[in-house]
């Protein structure tokens, strides 16, 4: 069961962190590797040492880019789930709290908290940015809550953290 705790329900999607950076790194790594191969092919008959250095430089750039992509994908799909479990698990929940998640995004902390609140409620507030590549929309958060089986305990609200649309002492905890 321990391994399962660090996973989302199948189908729940909490997103890839910095998707544009991941895409750009993958493209740069591929382009660098192709350019290095092309440089090697062109230079090898003229200057072997220079050709080898160009190939080595391109290979290093390609590997560094692939490493960045791999680490980012791992942290987006596994690492942040482990961090979430550590954060949420460290709080002694009663189960009846009202909890606010400020900047909830796709609901990673919001939904994990709602699972610990059988008699409580979890409210997520965010400035939704559907134009970005992250897919940060209230519908995505609510869909993740449905997939995780706690949709009835989750509410999402459009709001700015600098001017929250709630009265004082509306919540027992804020994430």
Give residue ranges: language-model regions.
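Short, flexible/disordered intra-domain loops and linkers
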Residues: 128-136
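S-adenosyl-L-methionine
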Residues: 135-160
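Conserved acidic residues
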Residues: 126-128, 160
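Conserved SAM-binding loop of SAM-dependent methyltransferases across substrates and taxa
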Residues: 106-118
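Class I SAM-dependent methyltransferase Rossmann-like catalytic core
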Residues: 14-29, 65-87
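N-terminal auxiliary segments of SAM/dcSAM-dependent transferases
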Residues: 2-62
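A short acidic, Gly/Pro-enriched loop at the edge of an enzyme's catalytic core
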Residues: 94-97, 162-174
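Conserved class I S-adenosyl-L-methionine
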Residues: 95-105, 123
